[in-house]
Amino acid sequence: MIIGIGSDLIDITRIAKVIERHGERFLDRVFTEAERAKAERRAKKSELVAATYAKRFAAKEACSKALGTGIRQGVWWRDMGVVNLPGGRPTMVLTGGAKTRLDALTPPGMTARIDLSITDEWPLAQAFVVISAVQAAAEQAGATSS
């Protein structure tokens, strides 16, 4: 059962300019430590760093739309983090207000599954999020919130 769907498209150069202008203040406010570590491993090429951050920014926007809140109502940027499953597939881990909102949307006896697709083609980055409620046994096969 689909709980929510969200998508976002962003100009990578916009994120690059914000990083240039606001630096650590922006990065600390929006991204988790794991997201920052992943982006900084690509530091040899600044456009790769900007694209990595832009995809994660778009994923957070898409996830907040799938939650039905946007970035408000107790859902904040760092409450949503992009992580990769062992096979490399991206998903979201929710904490704080985002997790509270997800729990409220998930029917009793079911588990939330978050499917995420992220991509970029300079100068654009895109993310698409589908949040589904699945039976507990199906949780083993996919990504879930933690």
UniProtKB/Swiss-Prot annotation:
Q: Which organism is it from?
A: Rhodopseudomonas palustris (strain TIE-1)
Identification of the protein by name? Holo-[acyl-carrier-protein] synthase
Query: What main location does UniProt list?
Result: cytoplasm
Similarity annotation: Belongs to the P-Pant transferase superfamily. AcpS family.
Q: Which UniProt keywords apply?
A: Cytoplasm, Fatty acid biosynthesis, Fatty acid metabolism, Lipid biosynthesis, Lipid metabolism, Magnesium, Metal-binding, Transferase
Q: Which HAMAP family match?
A: AcpS
E.C. no:
2.7.8.7
A GO molecular function assigned to this protein is: magnesium ion binding
Which InterPro entries does this UniProt record tie to the protein? 4-PPantetheinyl_Trfase_dom, 4-PPantetheinyl_Trfase_dom_sf, ACPS, Ppantetheine-prot_Trfase_dom
Q: What lineage is this protein's organism placed in?
A: Bacteria, Pseudomonadati, Pseudomonadota, Alphaproteobacteria, Hyphomicrobiales
